Amino acid sequence: MPLNRGHGMSKHLRSARHKALIAALKAARESAGITQRELARRLDRAHSFVGKIESGERQLNVLEFCEYADTLGADGAELLRTVLRARG
């Protein structure tokens, strides 16, 4: 079955799980004592990359998620468990 690219994406950007992911990533960054700008530098990305993720404007693919978590020194599996516990 083909993927329905783009259709319904905005629904996912407002889902409880996406909000839980944003909150978990932001909490991990703040716990690490890293600013958005510093995280972007460490990821070799534009500052807007982190800002758009934390504002809910952009989703991460799985590889970006792993890189993000690793850069923060966070346990990616635990972050995912937090997201999976969210409903909706």
Which residues make up each language-model segment?
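Short, basic-rich loop-to-helix N-cap that marks the start of a DNA-contacting helix
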Residues: E57-A69
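Recognition helix of helix-turn-helix/homeodomain-like DNA-binding domains
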Residues: L43-L60
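A short, Lys/Arg-rich alpha-helix, primarily the initiator
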Residues: P2-S31
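Short basic helix-loop element that most often maps to the first helix and adjoining turn
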Residues: A23-R42, E67
